[in-house]
Amino acid sequence: YQIDTTNLTTLAEVADYYNRQGNRSKMLDFEERLFKDSRAPVKDKEYRLQQYTNNMEFYRENYFRLGSIIVGLTIDYPTNRTFINAYAMHLIGGGATEEAYDYMLRHIDDASATADDYIMLLQYMMFLEKSDEEIQAMLDRATERFEGNDTLLSFKGFYYTEVEEYGKALKIFKQGVKRAKKLKDNKLRSQYLGYMGDIYHEMGKEQMCFRAYYDALLYDENNIPVLNNYAYYLSLTGRGLDKALTMAHLAMSLDKSNATYIDTCAWVLYKM
């Protein structure tokens, strides 16, 4: 019998049939028709593409055919972030690292760009070892565009911590504390105070580190990273070991699967 190639449901069913049979070449013949058909919902195209690109073995075996599909999708839907990011990752997978960077850069000011898209670009810039000036300029663009986005604000603070510009990192996290206070979000406030404690430790300012951790636990007594770090750094001083053990036990009980928290608890017991 003849297949009705004008029926989207039929095309999808036939593609899925060949997939189950292991005939990937025939499956892609029908997938290509689906992806090119303007009647097919964009969400369905996003879902089907992600299925194939997430399967790395399949992706490697069909790199060029999937690449052709992705290129077609970026032409048909030039502002769709799923397809934009898929093409960028496709270029990276093919070794075209600078071309991928230029492509991501061209699309970062699109109206459809999200805070996560900026973070992806920033991480890629760090991977490519772009200059500090370029990265910092992009960080500023991101936080200006998405003012009040805590993920971006934290990322910016972590970046300055990583490059040991602790003063700038502290300033950013203090902004976060003020923002959390205004929002009356105690968990967020605790989170930023914990980050500040980590920086003070890196700076060798022990008392300010402990004060920040203490304040963080006032706003969220179950802040696991703070409980763990406070316990560990306090134990290094040889003081307050009972308090350190209590915090280490609590951190471990709140996340039993994390080996770091188990190690901290064992370390504090050893110090006692």
Describe each PLM feature range.
Residues 1-272:
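Alpha-solenoid helical repeat scaffolds
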